């Protein structure tokens, strides 16, 4: 049985822990905690072993938390570590633990792909380059926005690539996650140099892509507005929707009033953590004018990358084919069932 450790217990770490407990081929060693707070007891109550920095073990135990050992102890036992630590700490963990201990590691989208702080030489998107991660020891899982763009752009290129001249995408990003204690300010902010464009072109280099990013005062998902320029008349609306009909992790919805509607429906349908873990094309917003096609889709920021991280475990540890990995991922996350439920709830 393979041993996996989750280094962090925030938005991503807590969700991955839920998923991994369902996989009988994997033993979840435990999770890492860096701050003494109520989330520690939450993890213990769920049956997870908690590991903390060696220098903080006494402080945690003085608060009556049952600590199983140091983070280094857990990493030493592991076959693979999912680094779900605070953005920017991945390179520190790689230098301190993963590289010296020769451990495979999955990093999240906030870590650097290039430069002196690069943690890996590849950004993963299961729709595009799953096979290339099979022999890798270190991989970055693309961020929720980058993952969502890949799920839309790759099928379009495969079907209409010769006719597409350029992609322009405006990322309307949520300010904070639902569980976040971060203040949601009454402001709209812009990113002068969003990383999403370069990140996506890392695994789809042929895309003639231009990305702008805004941050809006909401906790309810991201919304992407994508404009495609064609060499001539674009395909019909029906043809575009047919392109995505059978795509894994892409739902086609109609008449949702906003991202909050979808999130609330996910909670109502009792999806784990209230996540859909997919992108949702809003068919009523699909527009064609002359040589231009406009697609709007919402992106589940909290759940999007969780199945993607799980896919990386299938490749890096279990060496499964993409088809086998998708089948196993659907078994754990019920992606097809969730897609069907959402499309039924938001239909014509």
Predicted features and spans:
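C-terminal helical cap and adjacent loop that interface with cofactors, partners, or active-site loops
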Residues: 259-348
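Solvent-exposed amphipathic alpha-helical surface segments
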Residues: 23, 159, 251, 316-323
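A generic structural signal for alpha-helix starts
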Residues: 11, 147, 232-235, 304
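C-terminal substrate-binding/catalytic lobe of Rossmann-fold NAD(P)-dependent oxidoreductases
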Residues: 14-18, 22-68, 163-166, 170-173, ...
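Active-site catalytic microenvironments for nucleophilic, acid-base chemistry
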Residues: 155-159, 229, 315
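Hydrophobic alpha-helical scaffolding
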Residues: 6, 142, 189-190, 299-302
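N-terminal Rossmann-like NAD(P) cofactor-binding subdomain of oxidoreductases
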Residues: 1-178, 325-328
């Amino acid at each position: 049985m393979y041993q996996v450790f989750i280094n962090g217990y925030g938005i991503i770490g807590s969700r991955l822990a839920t998923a991994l407990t369902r996989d009988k081929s994997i033993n979840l060693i435990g999770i890492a905690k860096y701050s003494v707070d109520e989330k520690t007891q939450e993890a213990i109550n769920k049956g997870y072993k908690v590991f903390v920095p060696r220098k903080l073990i006494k402080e945690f135990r003085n608060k009556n938390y049952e600590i199983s050992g140091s983070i280094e102890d857990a990493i030493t036992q592991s076959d693979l570590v999912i680094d779900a630590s605070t953005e920017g700490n991945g390179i520190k963990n790689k230098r301190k633990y993963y590289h010296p201990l020769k451990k495979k590691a999955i990093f999240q989208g906030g870590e650097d792909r290039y430069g002196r702080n690069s943690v890996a030489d590849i950004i993963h998107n299961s729709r595009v380059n799953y096979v290339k991660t099979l022999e890798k020891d270190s991989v970055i899982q693309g961020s929720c926005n980058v993952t969502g763009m890949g799920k839309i752009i790759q099928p379009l290129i495969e079907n209409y690539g010769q006719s597409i001249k350029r992609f322009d995408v405006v990322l309307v990003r949520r300010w904070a996650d639902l569980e976040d204690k971060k203040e949601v300010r009454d402001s709209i902010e812009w990113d002068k140099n969003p990383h999403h464009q370069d990140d996506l072109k890392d695994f789809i280099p042929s895309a003639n892509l231009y990305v702008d990013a805004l941050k809006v005062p909401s906790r309810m998902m991201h919304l992407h507005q994508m404009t495609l320029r064609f060499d001539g008349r674009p395909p019909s609306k029906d043809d575009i929707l047919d392109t995505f009909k059978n795509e894994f992790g892409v739902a086609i919805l109609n008449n949702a009033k906003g991202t909050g509607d979808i999130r609330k429906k996910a909670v109502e349908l009792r999806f784990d953590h209230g996540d859909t873990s997919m992108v949702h094309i809003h068919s009523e917003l699909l527009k064609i004018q002359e040589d231009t096609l406009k697609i709007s889709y919402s992106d589940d920021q909290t759940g999007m990358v969780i199945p993607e991280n799980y896919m990386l475990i299938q490749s890096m540890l279990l060496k499964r084919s993409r088809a086998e990995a998708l089948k196993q991922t659907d078994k754990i996350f019920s992606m097809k069932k969730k897609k069907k439920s959402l499309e039924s709830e938001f239909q014509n």
